[in-house]
């Protein structure tokens, strides 16, 4: 059923006999030069080259460029051009050493200024430089970074994503709190009303005559010795409208309770009559 720990321990539910027909894992993978049974699993030469180029490009994009190496490469090119000019003038033999050195220095200054201008101008990758960029990953990394900077500027995104994600909501909330007016909540209103500076300025809801009448009643109660609250300017008199509303509410509650008791009495009487009928003998 199984061979070398490979296979099914039981054929039940597998819709097969459970026996291994071939052992593919024991066969060596054929090379690209000698394609055999596994040729359809292999990549062609063109696909292999395309994959290698993609890997090199990704590798160059991930790695950071070394600025010193690029600067050294530019200086080396300048010195190579100067040495070629110096060798050419020395072979001709028409000029002296001072003139040759002066021309070489002039060429060196010109090439240095030219390369400095090329660094300031952002250039894209051309097809002629693709092979050179694939070999020099530092240069490819610099150009890739320039492309990413242009993309970031185009989409107007910040360089520090953590600051953009964490600080922006907090700053927005802080600005909204500063701009929004102070909310007059119920707790703050009650605290201001309880404060001693506002007790004397509490709005008077009722007329003066009603307040005088209530103060007279309170003074009479104090004279009779009945317990009551101290009458002062800060005590609130009861509204006659509130008293009438409470009186009407009490009357309605009494009428409702009276109706409920009447319904309960009628219900009990009906239940008693039904019980009497059930106890009475049948007429036949």
From Swiss-Prot:
Compositional bias per record (Basic and acidic residues), positions renumbered to this chain: 148-196, 229-243, 250-284
Segments for region (Disordered): 148-284
Keywords (A to Z) from UniProt: Coiled coil, Cytoplasm, mRNA processing, mRNA splicing, Nucleus, Spliceosome
Domain of life (superkingdom): Eukaryota
GO biological process: mRNA processing; RNA splicing
Subcellular location: Cytoplasm; Nucleus
Residues annotated as domain CWF21: 70-114
GO cellular component: cytoplasm; nucleus; spliceosomal complex
Annotated Pfam families: cwf21
Coiled coil: 71-118
Subunit structure: Associates with the NTC complex (or PRP19-associated complex). The NTC complex associates with the spliceosome after the release of the U1 and U4 snRNAs and forms the CWC spliceosome subcomplex reminiscent of a late-stage spliceosome.
Family of the protein in this entry: Belongs to the CWC21 family.
Function summary: Involved in pre-mRNA splicing. May function at or prior to the first catalytic step of splicing at the catalytic center of the spliceosome. May do so by stabilizing the catalytic center or the position of the RNA substrate.
Name recorded for this polypeptide: Pre-mRNA-splicing factor CWC21
Organism annotation: Yarrowia lipolytica (strain CLIB 122 / E 150) (Yeast)
Organism ancestry: Eukaryota, Fungi, Dikarya, Ascomycota, Saccharomycotina
